[in-house]
Amino acid sequence: MTLLAKRQERSIVPRMYYITTAIDYTNGPPHIGHAYEKVLADVLARWHRMKGEEVYFLTGVDQHGQKVQQTAEKLGITPQEHVNNITGQFLALWDRLGISNDGWASTTDPRHKACVQKILTDLKDKGQLYKKSYKGFYSVRQEQFLTDKERDAEGNFGPEWGEVVELEEENWYFRLTDHVEWMKQFVEKSSDFVLPSFRKTEVLNAIDFDSDLCISRPKSRLSWGIEF
């Protein structure tokens, strides 16, 4: 009887379910794509709550970056004023759509800044960050350096990359290539980590990195970010 009671107790313990969305970029106002993602996440959160599971649904905004800085300059206002305005539009839309998120994250939040700085400091202390100079082509729209993989058959960068400029600068890099093998093994061995399962190959290809990740920008080019 005692064993049966314990099994019954374990069976009614609610399952924890965590849902997070992309954090929306605040260089411009929300559009249908933003709403589509949040509504899907909200449906998922409500469904798991109906099943009696404990849900934490997190969404938010990315308020830093070169595009935000450039947009604010064009409008003649500060980046903070610009992101405050755009963030207000996102929040108003989620309220109108009845999005039932439990948490809200913004990259200008002091808690977020402190967390990022702590993580980067720990990674640096563990030898996972290093500085190097790099010369290459940079997409202003996507805020990333491009490689030959991003060129089309004619050797050009497609319109999806927007303005592409050639840059040479020193930045901090994360040793992402050190982690490729264990990430691939984790995805391959986990039966329910990627759903639907037919997307597993796509995920494995996406994490098959052949270069480390650039994680910083020089202050001379970008002043609106988290200092490291």
Give the predicted meaning of each segment.
Residues T2-A5:
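Ala/Thr-enriched low-complexity intrinsically disordered regions
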Residues R7-R10:
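Basic polycationic patches enriched in arginine
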Residues V13-Y130:
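N-terminal Rossmann-like or analogous alpha/beta NTP/dinucleotide-binding catalytic cores
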Residues P14-T59, R111-C115, V165-F228:
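Structured secondary-structure scaffolds
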Residues I32, Q69-Q70, K149-R151, G225-E227:
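Short, solvent-exposed loop/turn and secondary-structure capping segments
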Residues V68, S139, L146, G158, ...:
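Short clusters of hydrophobic/aromatic residues that line enzyme substrate/ligand-binding pockets
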Residues L97-S106, K124-F137, K149-R151, E166-L167, ...:
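Short secondary-structure capping/junction motifs at helix and strand boundaries
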Residues K126-V180:
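Cys/His-rich short segments
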